[in-house]
């Protein structure tokens, strides 16, 4: 792997961690102490949602579904926490 690839992988990992932290922060603000209850209430597979909060890559459509459950727009999500 060349230097640019390594830099990108590091950047991607950092950004996914920020995304995960933001999702978790908003879930807790909504009153969900457990990610499992949030996932269940919003019809998102629990294991899959758990991976999102751990910083694994997710599809854009999956992010939109999570944001719908959090009752926040894409714009608000990125303005306030990024």
Where are these regions (language model features)?
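A short, Lys/Arg-rich alpha-helix, primarily the initiator
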Residues: 1-30
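Residue-level signal for the short linker/turn that defines the boundary of a DNA-recognition helix
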Residues: 21, 32-34, 58-61
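The alpha-helix within a helix-turn-helix
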Residues: 27, 39, 67
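Short alpha-helical DNA-recognition segment
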Residues: 31-51
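Short coil turns linking two alpha-helices in DNA-binding domains
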Residues: 45-48, 59, 73
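DNA major-groove recognition helix of helix-turn-helix
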Residues: 53, 70, 81
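DNA major-groove recognition helix of helix-turn-helix/homeodomain DNA-binding modules
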Residues: 61-76
């Amino acid at each position: 792997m060349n230097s640019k690839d390594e830099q990108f992988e590091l950047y991607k990992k950092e950004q996914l961690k920020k995304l995960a932290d933001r999702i978790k922060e908003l879930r807790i603000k909504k009153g969900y102490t457990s990610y499992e209850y949030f996932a269940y209430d919003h019809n998102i597979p629990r294991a899959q949602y758990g991976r999102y909060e751990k910083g694994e890559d997710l599809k854009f459509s999956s992010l939109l579904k999570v944001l719908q459950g959090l009752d926040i727009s894409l714009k608000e999500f990125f303005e306030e926490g990024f």
